A protein has these predicted regions:
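Signal peptide processing junction and immediate N-terminal pro/mature segment
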Residues: 42-50
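N-terminal amphipathic, basic helical "cap/leader" segment at the start of enzyme domains
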Residues: 5-11, 49-162, 247-248
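C-terminal helix-cap and adjacent tail motif
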Residues: 60-62, 232-253
Length: 253
């Protein structure tokens, strides 16, 4: 706008105008815009207005139902093919609780055992919209890193197809006393195995496909997620809907 061009907003800010009440229409529009900005629900993995990942609250886990234990054991299997369909929030909440949730709130103990109750295993959720840490106490996902890092969670091609991979990471800084006895570090593998089996049994009960692996590009994945030296990637386990089986060709000889 040149100096000679009249400013269309000049007269709005005169002393007289500032004393006038705001027209009802303008007030309603302003309040509506503000309400939308505050209350608009963000989709899982959505970014904040500043462009950063935000914590994702999970629905309360449903801890009843499911198949009988012996039936789930009979259905437990490893899969290497996954449909790309996203896992619903309720199913994800149930899965995470079954894997490593708090089943005794009074003392914070979990659904899987932990040597000396170190609770040194962190369960991370790797998805297309980012990587998140399962905060069992708050029942939410805390952002770890933006971006799709599923391809780094294994060396097989299928790892990038599953809608999510659960990453089991040991935080050795919680293992008080283990620094005096290095053999106690071996417990991290047992503790991770307990959680992995919980994941298997939940998936068997819910008709989901899952597969665990230890073959992971640990240095690349740790760098991508910004992990510290005391955080050790142990296992990764993909979860998703099973791929529908293709019926045999009746004309096949």
């Amino acid at each position: 706008m040149s100096p000679l061009t009249p400013n269309p907003f000049y007269n709005l800010y005169t002393e007289d105008n500032l004393k006038k009440p705001i027209p009802n229409t303008m007030l309603r529009v302003a309040m509506s815009v503000l309400a939308v900005m505050i209350l608009w629900p963000m989709a899982p993995g959505a970014r904040s207005w500043a462009g950063e990942l935000v914590p994702i609250p999970l629905p309360p886990p449903q801890t009843d139902g499911g198949k009988p234990l012996m039936q789930a054991l009979g259905l437990r299997a490893t899969s290497r093919a996954f449909a790309p369909d996203p896992i619903p929030a309720q199913t994800l909440s149930n899965l995470l609780w079954a894997a490593w949730g708090i089943n005794r709130p009074a003392d914070g103990k979990r659904t899987a055992p932990s040597a000396r109750n170190w609770q040194e295993i962190d369960l991370m959720v790797v998805r297309a919209d980012g990587t998140f840490h399962y905060d069992a106490a708050a029942n939410r996902l805390r952002p770890v890193a933006a971006g799709d890092h599923r391809a780094l969670t294994g060396v097989q091609p299928f790892v990038k197809d599953a809608p999510l991979t659960l990453l089991l990471v040991a935080d050795t800084s919680r293992m008080k006393g283990a620094e005096k006895d290095p053999d106690q570090r071996q417990w991290i593998w047992a503790d991770a195995g307990f959680i992995s089996q919980n994941i298997y049994l939940f998936c068997a009960s819910e008709g989901l496909a899952t597969g665990v692996r230890a073959l992971v590009d640990r240095p690349a994945l740790a760098k991508a997620l910004g992990l510290k030296e005391h955080q050790i990637i142990l296992l990764s386990q993909s979860v998703g809907r099973p791929v529908a089986s293709i019926p045999d060709n009746p004309n096949k000889k």
